[in-house]
A protein has these predicted regions:
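Active-site anion-handling motifs in enzyme catalytic cores
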Residues: 1-362
Length: 362
């Protein structure tokens, strides 16, 4: 770690979830592309015995793709304020950093930042329409958010929530994985150990249920191709993998995958069925024929927002308990309009970030 950084980033960039890893890396690369020095603030709290920080593929990812000097040590909550001596500004985001129950004791609202520091939010998500903020914490959270000089959020409903609840203005920008350049993604894909030869239907189901299983089997039968089930990135939770394999016993499991295999699995798939937000995002990015199952456990509103802005709500099943078999879902997708919207959203996100670095301090 160096003595000085332009920006310290607080987020879930270190997590074993594939989407979190790619989201955080996109933010790192994007901010650095503006010529800024970046410190990625590691998972706060005590890392002792934390399997996510000792045995996951994410540990290898951080070592491989980040400059080690750009990664902080683990600070306990009561020492995060020491980062003020190293960072001129702080950035929260992206992903569900403002979903209160997973905000690391409110530290994703950057309460440790000193007055006079520039505070930015880069595509932060509340996860749900109200961020699950309890009534007793609402006023305190509002006081933290009003300190930000520039706020962008990932979903339009978050923009409305900030205005209605706190009187705070924000802009909605696209999920950061859409900002990754094609060369970076291609290099990761080429490093994958997973190299499929035959067409396959990819399943990326984070929360398997019997109703999802039965619906998926109908699509597998109709497509007449083998199914591959990509397991969750949290390999330190073997019971989760076991349940996924049992629920999808008609599919070949792809486990112990890193982000390279995750990307390759989506890139090469002939068809995708997923209940993951980032699974949906990469299906769009890679021009897949896909079916997205809204996931209320992880914030169904996020799916509606992303697919609505990119003009692809026709690929969304909103109710995971009612998944129809419809041959229209099997048809190829014309991505011309979706790509136009993605280009527009990318330009907007980059323009917002450029303005945010120049915005007056609150």
């Amino acid at each position: 770690m160096r003595e000085h950084y332009d920006v310290g980033v607080a987020g879930f960039w270190f997590g074993a979830n594939y989407g979190s890893l790619m989201n955080g890396y996109a933010i790192y690369r994007t901010i650095k592309s503006f010529g800024k020095s970046v410190l990625m603030i590691h998972k706060p709290g005590d890392p002792t015995g934390d399997p996510e920080l000792t045995q996951g593929h994410n540990v290898d990812f951080v070592r491989k793709y980040y400059d080690p000097e750009d990664v902080s040590p683990h600070y306990p909550y009561d020492r995060l304020h020491e980062l003020n001596d190293r960072c001129d500004a702080f950035c929260a985001g992206s992903d569900q950093v403002w979903n209160y129950p997973i905000s690391f004791d409110e530290n994703m609202y950057l309460p440790f930042a000193e007055e006079g520091k520039r505070l930015l939010s880069f595509a932060s998500s509340f996860g749900t329409a109200d961020g699950n903020i309890p009534a007793e914490a609402s006023e305190r959270v509002g006081s933290y958010l009003r300190r930000f000089s520039a706020i962008s959020v990932r979903e339009k409903f978050a923009e409305r929530f900030l205005a209605d609840r706190y009187g705070i203005s924000a802009e909605t920008i696209i999920e950061p994985v859409f900002l990754l350049d094609e060369e970076t993604i291609d290099q990761m894909i080429s490093a994958s150990r997973f190299r499929p030869r035959d067409p396959y239907l990819l399943l990326y189901i984070l929360d398997p249920t019997e109703k999802k299983r039965e619906a998926i089997k109908r699509y597998v039968k109709a497509l007449k191709m083998r199914a591959v089930t990509l397991l969750d990135g949290k390999h330190y939770l073997p019971d989760n993998d076991k349940r996924n394999i049992e629920m999808h016993d008609f599919a070949v499991p792809l486990g112990q995958a890193g982000c390279e295999e995750f990307l390759r699995a989506f890139h090469d798939a002939a068809f995708v069925i997923t209940d993951s937000f980032h699974g949906t995002a990469f299906s769009l990015l890679f021009h897949k024929s896909f079916l997205s199952i809204g996931n209320p456990i992880r914030g169904r509103e996020r799916f509606l927002d992303l697919l609505g802005r990119l003009g692809r709500t026709d690929r969304l099943i909103e109710d995971p308990d009612e998944i129809p078999f419809d041959r229209r879902f099997l048809a190829p997708i014309n991505y011309d309009e979706t790509d136009r919207r993605i280009r527009q959203e990318r330009a907007h996100a980059m323009a917002w970030l450029r303005r945010a670095f120049d915005a007056p301090l609150s």
